[in-house]
């Protein structure tokens, strides 16, 4: 019998909002390539993620992983905080 390999989608981004209760908004940057001209350009997408302990703050670099749908817009949860935000930048 084959064992199921659990590979969940993992993304890294910057926390842009932590105002909601147990929810953060993470901006994830990706580089895409134009099919005709082959020029690379940056694309930013925002994802709502579940932060159970409310430990992430604005400006933190975090890793989020896919999970079952938690609400209408939340399909990710916070896995770990890779780098804390600097005091003067991002936090108010």
Swiss-Prot record:
Read off the CDD domains from this record.
Ribosomal_uS17 (cd00364)
Keyword Transport belongs to the record:
no
Q: Name the InterPro entries for this protein.
A: NA-bd_OB-fold (IPR012340), Ribosomal_uS17 (IPR000266), Ribosomal_uS17_bact/chlr (IPR019984)
- The residues that cross the membrane are none
Q: Name the Gene3D superfamilies on file.
A: Nucleic acid-binding proteins (2.40.50.140)
Q: Does the keyword RNA-binding apply?
A: yes
MF terms in GO: rRNA binding; structural constituent of ribosome
Q: Which terms in the GO cellular component ontology are assigned?
A: cytosolic small ribosomal subunit
Keywords for this protein: Ribonucleoprotein, Ribosomal protein, RNA-binding, rRNA-binding
Which GO BP terms, alphabetically?
A: translation
Task: Write down the NCBIfam families for this protein, in alphabetical order.
Answer: PRK05610.1, uS17_bact
Q: Cross-referenced PANTHER family, in alphabetical order?
A: 40S RIBOSOMAL PROTEIN S11 FAMILY MEMBER, SMALL RIBOSOMAL SUBUNIT PROTEIN US17M
Q: What does this protein do?
A: One of the primary rRNA binding proteins, it binds specifically to the 5'-end of 16S ribosomal RNA.
Which family does the entry's similarity section mention?
Answer: Belongs to the universal ribosomal protein uS17 family.
Subunit structure and binding partners: Part of the 30S ribosomal subunit.
Official protein name in the record: Small ribosomal subunit protein uS17
């Amino acid at each position: 019998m084959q064992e199921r390999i659990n590979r969940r989608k993992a993304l890294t981004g910057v926390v842009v909002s932590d105002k909601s209760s147990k929810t953060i908004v993470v901006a994830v940057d990706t580089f895409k390539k134009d099919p005709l001209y082959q020029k690379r350009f940056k694309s930013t997408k925002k994802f709502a993620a579940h932060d159970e302990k409310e430990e992430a703050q604005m400006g933190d670099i975090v890793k989020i992983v896919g999970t079952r749908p938690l609400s209408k817009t939340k399909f990710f949860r916070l896995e770990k905080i890779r780098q804390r935000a600097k005091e003067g930048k991002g936090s108010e």
